[in-house]
From Swiss-Prot:
It holds the Pfam family Thy1. DUMP binds at Q109, W110, I111, R112, E120, Y121, S122, A123, R124, R196, R223. The active site is at R223. Belongs to the thymidylate synthase ThyX family. This is Flavin-dependent thymidylate synthase.
Length: 302
C-alpha cells in the first residue's frame, strides 16, 4: 500500500483534528477514522465519515425522541429481531462514507451495487498512477471445471510464472504507451480522456463510496461470501471488521442471520424434515435438481 509522505502527513493531520459535537459518536469507529487499511498489493479502505450507531437503529425503530431504551440487552434484542425479520429502514438510518483504492476490474463488480453514492477519480482530468494489481502466485488459478464464474486449482511452477510475467509485461507496456500518447513536454499529445482507453483493467482507481447500513450489509453478504471473487472479497472482509467496531450489535446480528446463515427452498426444508424422520432421501426423490442437491448436501454437511 504505497502511500506517499504527503498522503501520510494529510492523514495524520486529519486524525489530529478534533471537534466538540452533539452527534452520536461510535468509539469503535472513531479509532478507524481516516486510517488507511491495506488491501491487495496497492489498495486500501479508509473511513472518511459515518452517521449513527446501534442506538440510532433502535431509535429509528421506536420512532423515539431520545436514545434507545436504557437497557443494552433490550437494544440488542430489538436489533436481532429487526435483522431476523428482514426489516430494512431502521438500518438505513446509519451511513458510512469510505475512500477506497481498488483495481478497475474490482470496481466494475463493486459498482453493480447501485444503492450507494459514488464519486470516482477521473482519468479525464488526471493522469493515473503506474500501479497495477498483480496477484500473488497462490491466487493465479485455472478456470473452475464446475463453476463458470469461479477458479479451480492454482497454477503451479512454470505455468504460474509464465502467466505472471505476461501480466507484468502487458501492464508495463500499456502504461508506457499511455504516457507516450499523452505526450511529452513540447508535444500536443492525445487527450487524457482518449489515452486512458488503452489501460488494462488491473490498473488502480480510487473513489469515495457512501452507503447506508442496510445496503452495506447486502453488499457484505454477497461479497464477503466464500464464493465471491477473492479480489473483491478481501475488501469486503476489511469492511466487515470496520462495521463490527462501528455497530457491534447490528454486525453480530448480521453475522448470525445473514453472513453465517443459509436459505433453504421449500423442497430442501421438506427433504430435511423427511431425513430427520428417518427416511432415506435421494436426489431423485427430493424434487431437487442435481446442482440444488449438491448445494443442499453442502449445507447439511453430507
Amino acid at each position: 500500500m504505497p502511500l506517499s509522505s504527503e498522503q501520510l502527513a494529510e492523514i495524520d493531520a486529519q486524525r489530529a483534528h478534533t471537534a466538540p459535537t452533539r452527534r452520536v459518536v461510535s468509539p469503535g469507529m472513531e479509532s478507524h477514522l481516516y486510517r488507511a487499511h491495506p488491501v491487495l498489493d496497492h489498495g486500501f479502505v479508509r473511513v472518511i465519515d459515518y452517521m449513527g450507531d446501534d442506538a440510532a437503529i433502535c431509535q429509528a425503530a421506536r420512532v423515539s425522541y431520545g436514545t434507545g431504551t436504557k437497557s443494552v440487552q433490550n437494544d440488542e434484542g430489538l436489533i436481532r429481531y429487526l435483522m431476523r425479520h428482514w426489516h430494512s429502514t431502521p438500518f438505513e438510518m446509519c451511513e458510512l462514507k469510505l475512500h477506497v483504492k481498488l483495481p478497475v476490474f474490482v470496481a466494475r463488480q463493486w459498482i453493480r451495487h447501485r444503492t450507494a453514492n459514488v464519486n470516482e477519480y477521473s482519468a479525464r482530468y488526471s493522469i493515473l498512477d503506474r500501479e497495477f494489481y498483480i496477484p500473488a502466485p497462490e491466487h493465479v488459478a485455472a478456470q473452475s471445471a464446475v463453476n463458470n464464474q469461479g477458479r479451480g486449482e492454482a497454477l503451479q511452477g512454470e505455468e504460474a510464472a509464465r502467466v505472471l510475467e505476461i501480466l507484468k509485461a502487458d501492464s508495463a507496456r500499456c502504461y508506457d504507451n499511455y504516457e507516450a500518447m499523452i505526450g511529452q513536454e513540447g508535444q500536443q499529445g492525445l487527450a487524457r480522456e482518449l489515452a486512458r482507453m488503452n489501460l488494462p483493467a488491473n490498473i488502480y482507481t480510487q473513489w469515495y463510496w457512501k452507503v447506508d447500513l442496510h445496503n452495506l450489509f447486502h453488499f457484505l453478504r454477497l461479497r464477503a461470501d466464500a464464493h465471491a471473487q477473492y479480489e473483491i472479497r478481501v475488501y469486503a472482509e476489511t469492511m466487515c471488521r470496520l462495521v463490527a467496531d462501528w455497530v457491534p450489535f447490528a454486525y453480530k446480528a448480521f453475522e448470525d442471520y445473514r453472513l453465517g446463515a443459509v436459505n433453504l427452498s421449500a423442497q430442501m426444508v421438506d427433504s430435511l424434515r423427511r431425513m430427520l424422520a428417518g427416511e432415506a432421501v435421494t436426489q431423485e426423490t427430493s424434487g431437487l435438481s442435481a446442482r440444488e442437491w449438491r448445494e443442499f448436501q453442502d449445507v447439511i454437511g453430507r
